[in-house]
Amino acid sequence: MRITPTTSGSAVPSLDEKNLGRIVQIIGPVLDVAFPPGKMPNIYNALVVKGRDTAGQPINVTCEVQQLLGNNRVRAVAMSATDGLTRGMEVIDTGAALSVPVGGATLGRIFNVLGEPVDNLGPVDTRTTSPIHRSAPAFIQLDTKLSIFETGIKVVDLLAPYRRGGKIGLFGGAGVGKTVLIMELINNIAKAHGGVSVFGGVGERTREGNDLYMEMKESGVINEEKIEESKVALVYGQMNEPPGARMRVGLTALTMAEYFRDVNEQDVLLFIDNIFRFVQAGSEVSALLGRMPSAVGYQPTLSTEMGSLQERITSTKEGSITSIQAVYVPADDLTDPAPATTFAHLDATTVLSRGLAAKGIYPAVDPLDSTSTMLQPRIVGEEHYETAQRVKQTLQRYKELQDIIAILGLDELSEEDRLTVARARKIERFLSQPFFVAEVFTGSPGKYVGLAETIRGFQLILSGELDGLPEQAFYLVGNIDEATAKAMNLEVESKLKK
């Protein structure tokens, strides 16, 4: 569906002309507002409360209409703290849904749920805005062609490839390299696909959001000198904010991504960290809105809310939005309604392993736990599929043999198993890769490896042609030619030492 962005100042009347209501009840982040007969606002309309609190401080709170209660009353959820609001305060109906700035002006900047910049870098051009509520693209506008979204990261492209316009779940604890992987994907989509990224921080820690921003500036993903040359827009609704903001910040980020897809006709990466917090925020306000709780206390509208967000993330004939969503699994229970509802929408899962991170293998993507619906011969081709399956079989066999190796040692294995272990260790190391965004920390230049190069490299390892090379030659290199060159260098170095 093509976006028709609104231009401020033309169609939207000023706040002074709007119809006025009054607050009749406040319960936490939820307000009831009475309007004159026949002047009821529509659902999802933005309401603005302006005034002064008892201490004389100015108040400016934006709310969103959620329910029409009858008796000329509406129930709305506040997007910021309701401290200082009192019954009888004037409420202005803006006559439209929340609208946020879109387009190139958003790149390199940090926004809140209302599309206001929060990075102290001055105002943003708001001439082009877009409402955060929109229906998903019509079926006829969708691009149904199955195509792989090449990331340039070997382990992802070979074993759990991403679908162009698909949704990927990113599972990983703290300190296993989620942020670095996210930044590398942002960097690679900009270089290889000429695309941009939008990062939606949904209910995440303020510290993490700040760290991500600082690391993006360090690695050049955000260009401080020429802000318009940045590759990412950031939208944050942090943990300390009311549930209304956390519930809608994902839609704000998605609206910015949709503009890049539909108007600029670009490939867009949309990161949502964390999709569970989106559900959690909805469940927090659900009871206050008078809804009966569903399973495990979640909102009864869980599937609908998730669907309305996820169905807008798709490929159209203009461009694509590929979404990578960090998924928190409460108490590691995959049957919990929140992650279970999310899984229904995912095309691929990328699982980060603490064990691999401890070994120093980065990206620490678990090659056996990560999955993708794209890894089928009819989509990726017979050669890619066969190579991926053989890599997985070799790694699986190595995993099965590890207990025997730990107890009895390598010497007790059969000749065939020893060969499998040697190749598996080479594969494990070859799945590591130096990242562009980590150059500033590691000093080794980043590598983008095309899919054909990746497949060729693993085929050579599996065929046994490279059995004579030391396994450290495969660690943190790009393609297989670099591994053979590194092996020669290691040989020269060892001779010089002698």
From Swiss-Prot:
Q: Which Gene3D superfamilies match?
A: 2.40.10.170, Bovine Mitochondrial F1-atpase, Atp Synthase Beta Chain, Chain D, domain 3 (1.10.1140.10), P-loop containing nucleotide triphosphate hydrolases (3.40.50.300)
Instruction: Report the SUPFAM superfamilies cross-referenced here.
Output: C-terminal domain of alpha and beta subunits of F1 ATP synthase (SSF47917), N-terminal domain of alpha and beta subunits of F1 ATP synthase (SSF50615), P-loop containing nucleoside triphosphate hydrolases (SSF52540)
**Keywords in alphabetical order:** ATP synthesis, ATP-binding, CF(1), Chloroplast, Hydrogen ion transport, Ion transport, Membrane, Nucleotide-binding, Plastid, Thylakoid, Translocase, Transport
Enzyme Commission number(s) of this protein = 7.1.2.2
Q: Which domain of life is it from?
A: Eukaryota
| InterPro entries (alphabetical) | AAA+_ATPase, ATP-synt_VA_C, ATP_synth_F1_bsu, ATPase_a/bsu_AS, ATPase_alpha/beta_chains, ATPase_F1/V1/A1_a/bsu_N, ATPase_F1/V1/A1_a/bsu_N_sf, ATPase_F1/V1/A1_a/bsu_nucl-bd
Catalysed reaction(s)? ATP + H2O + 4 H(+)(in) = ADP + phosphate + 5 H(+)(out)
GO molecular-function annotation terms? ATP binding; ATP hydrolysis activity; proton-transporting ATP synthase activity, rotational mechanism
Give me any GO biological process, just one. proton motive force-driven mitochondrial ATP synthesis
Q: How does it sit in the membrane?
A: Peripheral membrane protein
Q: Which locations, inside or outside the cell, does it occupy?
A: Plastid, Chloroplast thylakoid membrane
Record text on subunit structure and interactions: F-type ATPases have 2 components, CF(1) - the catalytic core - and CF(0) - the membrane proton channel. CF(1) has five subunits: alpha(3), beta(3), gamma(1), delta(1), epsilon(1). CF(0) has four main subunits: a(1), b(1), b'(1) and c(9-12).
Tell me its family. Answer: Belongs to the ATPase alpha/beta chains family.
The record describes the protein's role as: Produces ATP from ADP in the presence of a proton gradient across the membrane. The catalytic sites are hosted primarily by the beta subunits.
Question: What is the designated name of this protein?
Answer: ATP synthase subunit beta, chloroplastic
Q: Which species is the source of this protein?
A: Acorus calamus (Sweet flag)
